[in-house]
UniProtKB/Swiss-Prot annotation:
This is Major allergen Ani s 1. Disulfide bonds join C28-C84, C38-C67, C59-C80. Residues 28-84 form the BPTI/Kunitz inhibitor domain. It comes from Anisakis simplex. Keywords: Allergen, Disulfide bond, Protease inhibitor, Secreted, Serine protease inhibitor, Signal. GO terms for cellular component: extracellular region. Residues 1-23 form the signal peptide.
Length: 194
């Protein structure tokens, strides 16, 4: 009985931390705002910054023009991820709903045991459990997140959070690619190609 009380208390604390954690992260839901060019002499020069795209659930790069903008702007991808991506939260790619049982409850799966998921769904592990997510969207998101260059050239990588990662943005209009790379638009994201 005591272990059940401990489990209930832990679940309550986790739920509270998730709810309270989201309450002070409203800036992460703001749309991209590139700001405006600074007109004052000695103003901030344009630079690459990151914003949290609430729809995709990831941090994307863009060219910040130097002045103004909103609070959904971070100087590094690491800062963006630490502030906006809850490590104990998870969701299916592109905001798609996980599979549900006949009672409307989300189907829970474990690891690579996709036999627990209906056809067209795959097990996606979250922090504490797995959900059955639509396979088509999960595969598209994974492919796009790694970056694809239609030109056949390699994707430009950067040491963003301490490891090599693809430089991604929402659109080539966001002008986030370094000078030695060309932006190419994919189905979901834009990435930099060598």
């Amino acid at each position: 009985m005591a272990s059940m009380q401990h489990f209930s208390l832990a679940a309550l604390l986790l739920a509270a931390s998730i709810c309270l954690g989201d309450a002070d992260r409203t800036e992460c839901q703001l749309p991209l705002d590139k700001g405006t060019p600074c007109t004052q002499e000695g103003g901030v020069k344009p630079s690459v910054a990151w914003w949290h795209d609430d729809k995709s659930g990831i941090c994307l790069s863009f060219k910040y023009t130097g002045c103004g903008g909103n609070a959904n702007r971070f100087t590094t991808i690491k800062n963006c991820e630490q502030h906006c991506k809850m490590p104990d939260r998870g969701a299916c790619a592109l905001g798609k709903k996980p599979a549900e049982d006949s009672n409307g409850e989300q189907l829970v799966c474990a690891g690579m045991r996709e036999d627990k998921c209906p056809n067209g769904y795959q097990c996606k592990m979250m922090a504490f459990m797995g959900l059955c997510c639509p396979t088509k969207e999960e595969e598209l998101f994974a492919r796009e997140y790694e970056g694809v260059c239609k030109s056949g050239k390699p994707v430009k990588m950067d040491r963003g959070s301490g490891w090599m990662m693809t430089i991604l943005g929402k659109s080539c209009d966001d002008q986030f690619c370094p000078e030695d790379a060309k932006c190419e638009r994919g189905k979901l994201f834009a990435n930099c190609c060598k």
